[in-house]
Amino acid sequence: MIWFNKRIQIVPCEVSPRVCFSAAANFVGSGVLGGIGVVTLTKVKHRRELLFASLPTLFAIHQFTEGFVWLGLDGYLKPAATHYWGEAFMLFAQGLLPFLMPLSVQLFEPNTPSRRRMVPFTILGGITTLYMLWALMSFPTSIYVQGNSIVYINPGTQITALAAIYIICTCGSLFFSKEPPMVLFGGANLLALLFVMAVKRYAFTSLWCAYAAFASVIILAYFWQSRALRPFLYTKHA
């Protein structure tokens, strides 16, 4: 067990081809998502669409960072490097995503009434993000492999009530969108979340982010199919 600045502890796993395969899977998945992200961004027609359209690219970068976490856990990277990659993964998964998701939906909505419906989710997401960032900086995080998955444990974020708030922040705003594909994306994320909670709750942070990333193909499909209908007028009224 190795300690880093009293904040992250990495538990190296035994040398195993499984870990190399898992790292490769993350890197390949990141490349696929990166391609999806680039194509999605080429379909953007208004600055308000940019953050939501950037989600596949952000997920691609996120999966890329976890590939290095896998390599670090298997001893291919120096402990300090593994520490930084683990921090980067947790920063996005638990620190930024609860705020970025509702904000991206709020910006994308075409009129003021729709955007106002998103405000509570964005505010809650902002508060959640502030707490998550504080917890990640204040409590030690353990990172280790269990059941072929990476487990990220932080005492400050491992709270049931906080998990419920996290779900509301990341999925809730999508269900209140006027755009059916966004509701579909929210449903896909929620189903993935429930599946992970039922099957591998201990590896929730890693696996749900992976499933959510690949569900972002729905975002590409939406931008592709709606390119003739956008950009929205972004009016003040419905």
Where are these regions (language model features)?
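Hydrophobic transmembrane alpha-helical segments in integral membrane proteins
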Residues: 2-35
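Short aromatic-rich membrane-water interface segments that cap or initiate transmembrane helices
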Residues: 15-20, 83-92, 146-161
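Hydrophobic cores of alpha-helical transmembrane segments in multi-pass inner/ER membrane proteins
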Residues: 26-36, 93-106, 162-173, 211-227
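Internal transmembrane alpha-helix with an interfacial aromatic "cap," most often the third helix
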Residues: 36-41, 67-123
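Membrane-interfacial loop-to-transmembrane alpha-helix junctions, especially the N-terminal start
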Residues: 47-56, 117-120, 178-187
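Hydrophobic alpha-helical transmembrane segments of multi-pass membrane proteins
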Residues: 55-72, 188, 192-197
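Membrane-proximal helix-loop-helix units in multi-pass membrane proteins
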Residues: 97, 104-169
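C-terminal transmembrane-bundle signature of multipass membrane proteins
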Residues: 178-238
